[in-house]
Design a protein with these regions (language model features):
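Intrinsically disordered, low-complexity regulatory regions of eukaryotic regulatory proteins
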Residues: 16, 35, 76, 94-97, ...
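Hydrophobic alpha-helical membrane-insertion signals
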Residues: 20-72
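Boundary at the C-terminal end of the N-terminal hydrophobic targeting segment
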Residues: 12, 16-19
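Aromatic- and Gly/Pro-rich amphipathic surface segment
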Residues: 57-97
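Accessory beta-strand-rich segments of carbohydrate-active enzymes
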Residues: 20-26, 39-45, 79-81, 85, ...
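Generic cytosolic/nucleocytoplasmic N-terminal low-complexity/intrinsically disordered segments
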Residues: 12, 89-91, 139
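Bacterial N-terminal signal peptides
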Residues: 1-9
Length: 186
């Protein structure tokens, strides 16, 4: 599950010259949800670490449009990789983490955006309103959480002002891990 929003950044439909989603910096105290334009991919298919992944604009080849907030399974279902589990015995067609292991459901979530300018003395905060279960968070080639974010739907806030770029697309990459001990479904 991934749910995040930016403080002091306002989503608007305008697009930059490069075709990137444009975040416009509003008045202090305002915030916006950044639920659109996310992409996901199984971590073991991405042949680079988060520093490299977030350092350059994303090549969306092989990436799935992702739902945020949402789960890895929600993204897989919405992209037609598995049938709707609420019908018949379709839930039996979805691989159980106990049988396939954690790597099967460890995914990267990425999002790109541009900003025109950051007013002097202003800060931009990235707020995660719940990640299930662990996450490593990167922006523009830098890891922004020193320690791996771990826990069920914990909230966490990061000042991302020093990492933002106004001269190139910003790339946010979040590596989401499922719980370490998944239990036995019996």
């Amino acid at each position: 599950y991934l749910f995040c929003w930016l403080c002091l950044a306002c989503w608007s439909k305008p697009v930059s010259a490069e075709g990137q989603a444009l975040l416009v910096i509003p008045e202090p105290g305002e915030k916006t949800l950044i639920h659109s334009d996310w992409y996901a991919r199984k971590a073991n298919e991405v042949k680079m670490d988060g520093n490299r992944l977030s350092a350059v604009p994303l090549d969306k080849t092989g990436w799935l449009p992702a739902r945020v907030p949402g789960t890895v399974l929600t993204t897989l279902l919405e992209n037609g990789l598995y049938p709707a589990p609420e019908f018949g015995l379709n839930n039996n067609l979805i691989p159980d983490i106990h049988e396939v292991g954690n790597d099967f459901y460890t995914y990267w979530f990425t999002r790109q955006f541009t900003i025109d300018a950051l007013p002097e003395g202003r800060n931009v905060w990235l707020n995660f309103r719940g990640i299930n279960y662990k996450a490593e968070i990167f922006l523009n080639g830098k890891r922004i959480n020193r320690n791996t974010h771990e826990g069920m739907f914990l909230r966490k806030t990061f000042n991302i002002t020093p990492y933002l770029r106004t001269d190139a697309p910003n790339v946010l990459a979040v590596l989401v891990y499922p719980p370490t001990h998944v239990g036995n479904p019996n």
